[in-house]
Amino acid sequence: MKYDAFVVGGGPAGSTAAWDMARAGLKVALLDRAGRIKPCGGAIPPRLIRDFDIPDHLLVAKITSARMISPTGRFVDIPIENGFVGMVDREDYDEWLRERAGKAGAERLTGTWLRIERDSGKTVVVWRDKVTGEEMKAETRVVIGADGANSQVRNEVPATKIPLVFAYHEIIKAPTTVANYDPTRCDVYYDGRISPDFYGWVFPHGKTASIGMGTELPDVSLKDCTTLLRQMSGLDKEETIRKEGAPIPLQPLDVWDNGKDVVLSGDAAGVVAPSSGEGIYYAHAGGRYAAEAAMAFLKSGKPADLKLARAGFMKEHGTVFKVLRMMQDKYYHSDDRRERFVSLCHDVDVQRMTFESYMNKKMTKFQPLKNLKIGFKNLAHLSGLVPPQWT
């Protein structure tokens, strides 16, 4: 077997890369392990739906507001103006993406990546077939590694270690009688009892809901914290359907390619947003940039073109990632700071700028007076000049 491109990982990043390259007329293989549902909150913003042609039938819920809840129980409801955030179930969503790539011409393979063998200048991918258990081999011109936070393909790249948040959630049957539950609202808990350095969440998914939390600290019990969150949110009596956990990377790698024939994408490249943990949009975007870089390399024969994947992604999204990392570093590490963060969220201009950036995946236009006001409030809270509840 010979391919122009061999994509490892069938999530949003890998499926998008395979879809784009297959539509361009290239011979593409898409290898996925199958049989595992990616633990994920499942939120997709309008720009994702537009840019990647996501049909409405995949949306299990449409979110029109978000509630931010502080350690003392204060909360602010933030409306999503002029639109909604879609929610997807990753089991159905990811399979639909793989099917779409297959319909475009990508050859779907099911199995586990093993290694790359290089002989006489050729790049040979080796994987284990899920059905037969046999080692399979295929020659390819380029490999796209989109195999998640614990990527094995990443071993081919001189990559640095990625900081990880360990996320855990429980899928429950959506309640019908819990007073504080709104099927069109995402609830976000900034509370050190739930997470000492990240947040907890309740995300509606139509007939089900995702409730969970994340942390970088290895000695925190994710299950105990989620149990407490269920009690605090009034969801401890609802039926549990399944429990899932997974690492989430929170920093893009400095290098995404090996300078020869491999380029990374999605979680494998570390492109999950700090502060929010949002990854689906950035996985799609990273997959597209990886495909563009791979196609440039295939056309020119110059391995340097593989660097276009990271360069393009960081040019478009790097500033947003820096701002979100700064916000996480400043506000997520004590209940005093978390209380202050929720206080900031009471400001209507903060709400509008935050959701405009989230919905469209770009920084909002600079508005001198509003930016000055928000900057003053940040300084006042970070310096402790005002009480935590000051809005």
UniProtKB/Swiss-Prot annotation:
Pfam families: FAD_binding_3 (PF01494), NAD_binding_8 (PF13450). Its EC number is 1.3.1.83. It catalyses: phytyl diphosphate + 3 NADP(+) = geranylgeranyl diphosphate + 3 NADPH + 3 H(+). Pathway: Porphyrin-containing compound metabolism; bacteriochlorophyll biosynthesis (light-independent). It comes from the Bacteria. It comes from Rhodobacter capsulatus (strain ATCC BAA-309 / NBRC 16581 / SB1003). InterPro entries: BchP_ChlP_pln/prok, FAD-bd, FAD/NAD-bd_sf, Geranylgeranyl_Rdtase_fam, Geranylgeranyl_reductase. Disulfide bonds: none annotated. Catalyzes the stepwise hydrogenation of geranylgeraniol to phytol during bacteriochlorophyll A (BchlA) biosynthesis. This is Geranylgeranyl diphosphate reductase.
